Structures are given as structure tokens and as C-alpha cells.
A protein has these predicted regions:
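Gly-rich Lys/Arg/Thr-decorated short loops/hinges at beta-loop-alpha junctions or inter-strand turns
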Residues: 1-3, 113-116
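Glycine-rich phosphate-binding "P-loop"
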Residues: 1-20
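General beta-strand structural signal in soluble alpha/beta enzymes
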Residues: 12, 31-34, 58, 88-92, ...
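Short, surface-exposed connector motifs at secondary-structure boundaries
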Residues: 20-29, 52-53
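Gly/Ser/Thr-rich loops at beta-strand to alpha-helix junctions
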Residues: 30-40, 63, 125-129
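Histidine-anchored nucleotide/phosphate-binding helix
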Residues: 37-50
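Long, charge-dense
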Residues: 53-112
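Internal alpha/beta core interface subdomains
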Residues: 115-143
């Protein structure tokens, strides 16, 4: 297990290296979260260089996560990834989705949000890993 001193994108490079190394050693596929495609493109390049032959699934944010009706992931990046064998999944966030709307409107907390808050106690990255795995599983990209 690796524990980083600081949070955020500063850890992406090392995290991708660890994920690739572990996936190769254990013959695993990789699910990667990528809001705008930068992390997925970086992983794609690293995977090619490392000779990684497993499946890579990229999970992007749902439409409207930043601007109503828009997706932060450009079609150009999606096409590049897909042409290189990476499946791009765009879906409602598994640990917020509809419940977050109810919380905002009625001021209550619902079970799925409690799960998300519990996972965040281990770190935002832990919550994101669980969430994108659920999203990839829900749409049939992994089994």
C-alpha cells in the first residue's frame, strides 16, 4: 500500500506506475478515472511502453458534472482512446447520482451517500476507485 503525503494530481504519475506494475504482475485489467482524459491518455502511453496487454477501461464524469448538458471529456480524446483499445464509460456517479439531488433539495442524507462519506474517511481516492469500478461494472465493461 502506498500512502501519499499530499492529495491530488501530483500523485497521478506514481499511481499509474503502481497500477500498471501491479496489473502486469497479477494479470489484472485496469479501470481508471479520468474527468477530461489526461490521466487516461497518460495511462495509454505508459501501457504501450510497458507492453501491458490487459484491458483498460476509462470512466469519465457524467454529463453536467461541471456545466449542465455538457461532458468534460472531448470527443477527440474519447476517439483516440477507443482507437487504442480503451473503452470509455460515461455514467451517473454510482455513489451520488440521484441521492445527491435529494440531499440538496430536502436536506437529508441517504444510504449511498453514507457509503461515499465512509469511503472518503480512507481518502477521496479510495472512494473514487470503488465508484468507478461500480460504474464500469454497471455498464458491462468489466466482470
Amino acid at each position: 500500500m502506498t500512502i501519499f503525503e499530499k492529495t491530488g494530481p501530483v500523485n497521478s504519475e506514481e499511481t499509474l506506475n503502481i497500477a500498471l506494475k501491479t496489473a502486469k504482475e497479477r494479470n489484472l485489467d485496469i479501470v481508471v478515472a479520468s474527468s477530461e482524459g489526461d490521466t487516461a491518455l497518460n495511462l495509454m502511453q505508459k501501457a504501450k511502453e510497458a507492453g501491458f496487454a490487459g484491458k483498460i477501461v476509462c470512466v469519465s464524469c457524467a454529463y453536467g458534472s461541471k456545466t449542465p448538458g455538457e461532458n468534460r471529456f472531448s470527443q477527440e480524446r474519447r476517439t483516440t482512446l477507443e482507437q487504442n483499445g480503451i473503452r470509455v464509460v460515461t455514467a451517473a456517479h454510482a455513489l451520488s447520482g440521484g441521492e445527491r439531488g435529494l440531499t440538496k433539495m430536502f436536506g437529508s442524507v441517504h444510504p449511498v451517500e453514507l457509503i461515499a462519506y465512509t469511503l472518503r474517511m480512507f481518502g477521496q481516492g479510495t472512494k473514487v476507485c470503488v465508484e468507478v469500478a461500480l460504474m464500469a461494472l454497471d455498464c458491462g465493461s468489466i466482470s
